Amino acid sequence: MPFTRFDRYVDRHARSFTERLQALCRMPSVAARGTGMRAVAESVEQMMQRVGMGTRSFRVGNGYPIIYGECGSGSRSFVLYGHYDVQPVGHLTEWSVGPFAASIIDGKLYARGAANSKGDLVARMAAVEAYQKTFGRLPVSLRFFVDGEAGLGSPSLYRFAAENPELLAAQGCIWDEGYKDTKERPVISLGFKGIQFLELRAHGARTDLHSKWGAIVPNPAWRLVQALATITSPKGVITIDGFSSCIAPISAEDTEALKAIELDEAGLKREFRIGSWVRSLKGPALVKEHIFGPTCTICGIQTGHTEAGVKTVLPSTAMARLDFRLVPDLTPGLVLELLRAHLDVRGFKDIEINELGSAPLAKSSGGSSVARAVISAATEIYGGPPLVYPMDPSSGPVGAFCGALALPTPVASFGISYAGSNPHGPDENIRVDDFLESIKFIGRVIHKLGEHKSRTSGITKVSGIREGRLTNSRG
């Protein structure tokens, strides 16, 4: 394949491409805060236009803009999903550099959103530019959808999908989640777990009280902790009534796929600075649990006085936020119903449940044209076959593209992160060399998309498509 000119173009423009990424990363776009969102959306649209895309900006209600861009031609179309919003920064004291400084230190670009996923977005646009400059016309039609609400559960995207099905009809979808593991092996995923993100609240007195009342006034903090303790066992197994019986058995195809996957257990434990895995899992059992195990994670608890100094207070409220990662046959709605019933039967009808966002599970076959193109390109650019996950342990609004309106669109996902990128955490970063290498990888993916045709129908599972929204459930 004649990619010499393409690779040289990327090398010659490496500084320019990197500066484009730095410029985008220096623009805060935390969806949960709302600051700067429209400015970043406009910048993304301008970047698309710069590489020759026709663009449109869509607004759904009061949501942040969805930026759509298209380029190329031909009867075969492929969707590329990305997002311009980023996670909240967290505690600034935990960052070594400013989260929006986009500083490059020892070959690593540090910024909130560099790994998740402004780096992927800029790399894909750079690949389109490089391909058109060196090959000319794109061999397929590419449709970019850039979301502004990924951190909020992408509520606008599901409505957009329902109202614009003609834009979503495609032979495949390329997602923006992926990384190199601790052994520098690229990870390609053919689907994603679903997610249900919930907030649980317990209520006590009208206001916070002096803690002298603690002997006779109910404490909502203890009430919430006691309710949470019924949801999992001390070993981390989800104990919600009826939960495990709703999970589908792992298919023969997925069981076979798991055999080719291994985790660098020692390297990951060093990276995370942990002594052991949950339930002392290891080997194939660890891989199986990581990819096909459901989760219930307490993401945060808030109650009472946690600031500096001493304050003897009896809290009036207590709140916990949980996310459930969902495997085949578990849906967001089902999890909400099971949890409500589980708490009610144990006397916790007073615990309020608010649904903050959700996304369905979606997974597809390795025989689709998009999967084969991505795997082939990865093998070529990285010097060996990638690790192929039948389902990524993370989640996203994949169902909007790969199951909404019965569109049988297969998905393949990859990204520019590495094991130390720490997306969602402090000092989020990518390696600049990985960013530039990814541009070359994407160029080859585009080329191969024009060559490969599906051996299978593609999509194999979409569970519980549902728009992320805020609801209230109280027994």
Predicted regions and their residues:
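An extended, acidic, His-containing surface patch that forms the Zn2+-binding/catalytic region
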Residues: T182-K183, T239-T317, R325-L338, R346, ...
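Acidic/His- and Gly-rich active-site-bordering loop/insert found
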Residues: P2-R112, K133-L142, L322
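Flexible glycine/proline-rich, aromatic-decorated loop/lid segments
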Residues: V187-H203, V411-Y418
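Acidic, glycine-rich active-site loops and adjacent beta-strand->loop/helix elements
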Residues: Y84-V86, F145-S154, D176-K180, G204-T207, ...
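Short pre-catalytic strand/loop immediately N-terminal to key active-site residues, enriched for Gly-Thr
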Residues: I105-N116, G384-V388
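Acidic/histidine-rich catalytic neighborhood of metal-dependent amide-processing enzymes
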Residues: L109, A115-G191, R455
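A common structural junction motif
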Residues: D85, I231-K235, R340-K349
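A short core secondary-structure module
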Residues: G214-G236
